[in-house]
A protein has these predicted regions:
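Acidic/histidine-rich helix-loop elements
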Residues: 44-51
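Active-site-adjacent pocket-lining segments in enzyme domains
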Residues: 2-40, 52-151
């Protein structure tokens, strides 16, 4: 079975977490949820994350990039401000990228890509307030709703 992982934290943008969570399940992925806090949290709009109360939340120390086929990084600027400070999470993202596996980054989740130093020379779409940060990190910023560049 294919495995996906969603990495985020408290105050993630609810729909940016929930939609990929259920879409992965619908596509028969086993989905792990790794939250900075190591326990269920609330989204920015108050939704329980993960939405399934029986879903076990993992800590970053419990996960290995070798075990997953896809990584999802939902947005939520308040969450990303804290998540990007966790060096173990940043290393996970960097190691995942080094294996050329799919990374789906939504909105301000691109902050994690900047911190992992994996945006240089890549087309990246992100929340408009991150445009300067992405360009300064070497990304080719686009305001398209979605973009694919390599993995």
């Amino acid at each position: 079975m294919r495995k996906g992982i969603i990495i985020s934290g408290n105050l993630a943008q609810d729909h940016e977490f929930i939609y990929p969570y259920y879409r992965l399940l619908e596509e028969d992925f086993e989905v792990d949820v790794c939250l900075l806090e190591g326990k269920p949290v609330k989204g920015f709009l108050g939704t329980d994350l993960p939405p399934n109360k029986n879903h076990k939340v993992k800590k970053i120390e419990e996960v290995n990039p070798n075990d997953y086929d896809i990584l999802v990084l939902p947005g939520g600027v308040k969450a990303m401000e804290k998540v990007r400070q966790n060096l173990d999470i940043i290393k996970f993202i960097s190691d995942f990228n080094a294996q050329n596996k799919i990374i789906a980054c939504i909105c301000s989740g691109a902050q994690l890509l900047i911190s992992a130093k994996i945006v240089k020379g890549r087309k990246i779409a992100g929340y408009y307030s991150m445009k300067d940060d992405l360009i300064n990190a070497g990304a080719i910023y686009t305001d398209l709703p979605a973009v694919v560049d390599r993995n």
